[in-house]
UniProtKB/Swiss-Prot annotation:
It is found in: Cytoplasm. It comes from the Bacteria. One of its GO terms (molecular function) is protein-folding chaperone binding. The keyword Mitochondrion does not apply. This is Protein GrpE. Pfam families: GrpE. PANTHER family: GRPE PROTEIN, GRPE PROTEIN HOMOLOG, MITOCHONDRIAL. Belongs to the GrpE family. The gene is grpE. It comes from Enterococcus faecalis (strain ATCC 700802 / V583). Residues 1-23 are annotated as: Disordered. Residues 1-10 have a biased composition (Basic and acidic residues). Homodimer.
């Protein structure tokens, strides 16, 4: 073989080697690209899930804040109710002199101002007298026989007023019910 033929053969072998290496290099790069695409897809999925979780947390916090604002006077209302009961008991006392009447008038004014303040905060008395008994709003402490005037499950007497804040019962009405 001549030198020229040897050189051509050598070049041919090198080209075949380069072609083989190039093909395997392209295959490696294609595999790498697929792996990177899969990883990117996984990261996008994680990102979307994290974003959704943050949105859910934000909504949950917003709802909790709204509930806190809506029911902020619940504890205060529960603490004031015994004082209202005492003022109402004081109003029930019979007085015979002018000084007693004056004192009773002052108590009435205080009771009225507290009642107005509670209404402004959303705290209201639960209607009970003559109403149909509702175990969600009333607590029956005694029963009496029903009559023609008072049908069964009717409240005949209120022993202690009940109060509610918006749709929550702060204290049920303690009542006597006809059975």
């Amino acid at each position: 073989m001549s030198k020229k033929e040897e050189k051509q053969e050598e070049l041919q072998e090198e080209m075949e080697a380069v072609d083989a290496a190039g093909v395997s290099e392209v295959e490696v790069e294609a595999t790498e690209i697929e792996n990177l695409k899969a990883e990117l897809s996984e990261m996008e999925d994680k990102f979307l899930r994290a974003r959704a979780e943050i949105a859910n947390m934000s909504n949950r916090n917003k709802n909790e804040r709204e509930l806190l604002v809506r029911y902020r006077s619940q504890d205060l209302g529960k603490k004031i109710l015994p004082s209202i009961d005492n003022l109402e008991r004081a109003m029930a006392i019979e007085v015979s002199d002018e000084q007693g009447e004056s004192l009773k008038k002052g108590i009435s004014m205080v009771l009225e101002s507290i009642t107005v303040a509670l209404k402004e905060e959303g705290i209201e008395e639960i209607p009970a007298m003559g109403e149909t008994f509702d175990p969600n709003l009333h607590q029956a402490v005694q029963t009496v026989p029903a009559s023609e005037e008072t049908p069964a499950d009717t409240i005949v007497e209120v022993l202690q007023k009940g109060y509610k804040l918006q749709d929550r019962v702060l204290r049920p009405s303690m009542v006597i019910v006809a059975q």
